[in-house]
From Swiss-Prot:
GO-annotated molecular function: chromatin DNA binding; DNA binding; DNA-binding transcription activator activity, RNA polymerase II-specific; DNA-binding transcription factor activity; RNA polymerase II cis-regulatory region sequence-specific DNA binding; RNA polymerase II transcription regulatory region sequence-specific DNA binding; zinc ion binding
Protein name per the record: Zinc finger protein ZIC 2
Gene that specifies this protein: Zic2
Organism: Mus musculus (Mouse)
Signal keyword on record: no
Keyword Nucleus in annotation: yes
Length: 530
């Protein structure tokens, strides 16, 4: 049932909910009189005796809460004088019967109602304001003098969160034709003005008659969570800047220039094609059709400007097509694995790359006893140098060579860190290099230093040489060298200058053994490292 907003709507949560028993008879009489007047007004509205704008208005469906509103909010519905609205005589009688409690009832006072039930409150209508300081376009002409003015300090009762009005050229952009965007789903708009009179009539191009058949009653459940609805609307509302950025990206066009030089040109110097294209597909199609030609072409030469091949032909057309991608930048083979994003110019490169995702290693080392496997044949070829002792990767700054390019790159860092290229740095040692580590060099490698040593130091050096000779004998299997070195060591430890000299000789022999032993050790270490 659609109730009228006048005598049926009391001040929400104020005195109308707490009735007093000694006024029940007067309230019942007022309710009966008010119901009779309302039925007469509704019947007259159906017969066309009252203004259509006053009879047909939108409505808000309200679910009043159990708590009471503050006096400041309840004062939004101020008192009105008798005779301002149909049925006001009954309202005046009810106010007189209530006596001292009449202050608790607002201008829309009426009979009490059950707070647990829903009621309807008529929303403000649309229409031109009455001339001569009438209502501000809220109701029809017949209801222009219903409300008194309200102060600007009062807040909205239905939507307390609405910001205050702004006037002048800097008014809020959310206010359009007296309507404010409430931030609710469905683009609901509400009036930003309060219930008050204005000095001048509102210039509204839409009259009440025009809007009568366009806007029906609007029901809105006020028990919903307003804050959650506004947050939901804000979350799904995209900022307009994202759209403009997207459109700007679509408007940016690439300029791909064809640099193919026609060899049949008579001019000198010859000029390139210089045709521009907006997409890579257009450029590739142009080069394939206009310059490369079909299967009738027997000479597959790249005539792209500044091509490093310098006119050297290809054996097949597909090889020329693959080569042209170096100039055009075309990479038509993307990696299908999600999140990778890599693209390739050749299908075989994509095939090799996909093995990094699948873990496939189909290329096994061909050397007997080695079970190393690789994802591509080039890595296996580099690995084979470990077994064949080939060291094709030479250092350009020194005479060292390596079996793998990664070892050469590590070695080049030594030259970058030390400009003099010191070869005694431990960082220069690698499993692939052929030089002797400095820690295993025999003291006899520097014969000039042994003559300046004391007898005790010479004996210690001879002992170290004997130990090195023993290591050499283990790797070489030569027992005679070990015994000779041991004899030299014993002679060196016997004392005297001659003993020192004998120790030096033994040290020398041990040095040669150490060198040979290290060769075998280095070879074994290379196999283990790789």
């Amino acid at each position: 049932m659609l109730l009228d907003a006048g005598p049926q709507f009391p001040a929400i949560g104020v005195g109308s909910f707490a009735r007093h028993h000694h006024h029940s008879a007067a309230a019942a009489a007022a309710a009966a009189a008010e119901m009779q007047d309302r039925e007469l007004s509704l019947a007259a509205a159906q017969n066309g005796f009252v203004d259509s704008a006053a009879a047909h208005m939108g409505a808000f469906k309200l679910n009043p809460g159990a708590h009471e509103l503050s006096p400041g909010q309840s004062s939004a519905f101020t008192s009105q004088g008798p005779g301002a609205y149909p049925g006001s005589a009954a309202a005046a009688a009810a106010a007189a019967a209530l006596g001292p409690h009449a202050a608790h009832v607002g201008s829309y006072s009426g009979p009490p109602f059950n707070s647990t039930r829903d009621f309807l409150f008529r929303s403000r209508g649309f229409g031109d304001s009455a001339p001569g300081g009438g209502q501000h376009g809220l109701f029809g002409p017949g209801a222009g003098g219903l409300h008194h003015a309200h102060s600007d300090a009062q807040g909205h009762l239905l939507f307390p969160g609405l910001p205050p009005e702004q006037h002048g050229p800097h008014a809020s952009q959310n206010v359009l034709n007296g309507q404010m965007r409430l931030g609710l789903p469905g683009e609901v708009f509400g009036r930003s003005e309060q219930y008050r009179q204005v000095a001048s009539p509102r210039t509204d191009p839409y009259s009440a008659a025009q809007l009568h058949n366009q806007y029906g009653p609007m029901n809105m459940n006020m028990g919903m969570n307003m804050a959650a609805a506004a947050a939901h609307h804000h979350h799904h509302h995209h900022h307009p800047g994202a759209f403009f950025r997207y459109m700007r990206q679509q408007c940016i066009k690439q300029e791909l220039i064809c640099k193919w030089i026609d060899p049949e040109q008579l001019s000198n110097p010859k000029k390139s094609c210089n045709k521009t294209f907006s997409t890579m597909h257009e450029l590739v199609t142009h080069v394939s059709v206009e310059h490369v030609g079909g299967p009738e072409q027997s000479n597959h030469v790249c005539f792209w400007e500044e091509c490093p091949r310098e006119g050297k032909p290809f054996k097949a057309k597909y090889k020329l097509v693959n080569h042209i991608r170096v100039h055009t930048g075309e990479k038509p083979f993307p990696c299908p694995f999600p999140g990778c994003g890599k693209v390739f110019a050749r299908s075989e490169n994509l095939k090799i790359h996909k093995r990094t995702h699948t873990g496939e290693k189909p290329f096994q080392c061909e050397f007997e006893g080695c079970d190393r496997r690789f994802a591509n044949s080039s890595d296996r070829k580099k690995h084979m140098h470990v077994h064949t002792s080939d060291k094709p990767y030479l250092c350009k700054m020194c005479d060292k060579s390596y079996t793998h390019p990664s070892s050469l790159r590590k070695h080049m860092k030594v030259h970058e860190s030390s400009p003099q290229g010191s070869e005694s740095s431990p960082a220069a040692s690698s499993g692939y290099e052929s030089s002797t580590p400095p820690g295993l060099v025999s003291p006899s490698a520097e014969p000039q230093s042994s003559s300046n040593l004391s007898p005790a130091a010479a004996a210690a050096a001879a002992a170290a040489a004997a130990a090195a000779a023993a290591v050499s004998a283990v790797h070489r299997g030569a027992g005679s060298g070990s015994s000779g070195s041991g004899g030299g060591s014993a002679a060196g430890s016997g004392g005297g200058g001659g003993g020192a000299g004998g120790g030096g000789g033994g040290s020398s022999g041990g040095g040669s053994g150490t060198t040979g032993g290290h060769s075998g050790l280095s070879s074994n270490f290379n196999e283990w490292y790789v």
